[in-house]
Amino acid sequence: MAVQQNKKSPSKRGMHRSHDALTAPALFVDSTTGEVHRPHHISPNGMYRGRKVVKAKGE
């Protein structure tokens, strides 16, 4: 098992973890229905870029 040579200070530990933060997902408002969904994904009602591409649940 690997063993560290020198102790990593709290400052260096924080710098090492600086890229681990989570970001909120980008959201897109559909211009036709006003529903919010992720960009490049199908909206919950089955619309993509203003066209109906799949049947929504319950149709």
From Swiss-Prot:
Keyword vocabulary terms for this entry: Ribonucleoprotein, Ribosomal protein
GO BP terms: translation
GO cellular component, one term: large ribosomal subunit
GO molecular function ontology, one term from the record: structural constituent of ribosome
Bias kind Basic residues: ranges: 49-59
Cystines in this chain: none
Chain residue ranges for the region called Disordered: 1-59
NCBIfam families listed in its UniProt record: rpmF_bact
Similarity-based family: Belongs to the bacterial ribosomal protein bL32 family.
Protein name, UniProt field: Large ribosomal subunit protein bL32
Source lineage: Bacteria, Pseudomonadati, Pseudomonadota, Betaproteobacteria, Neisseriales
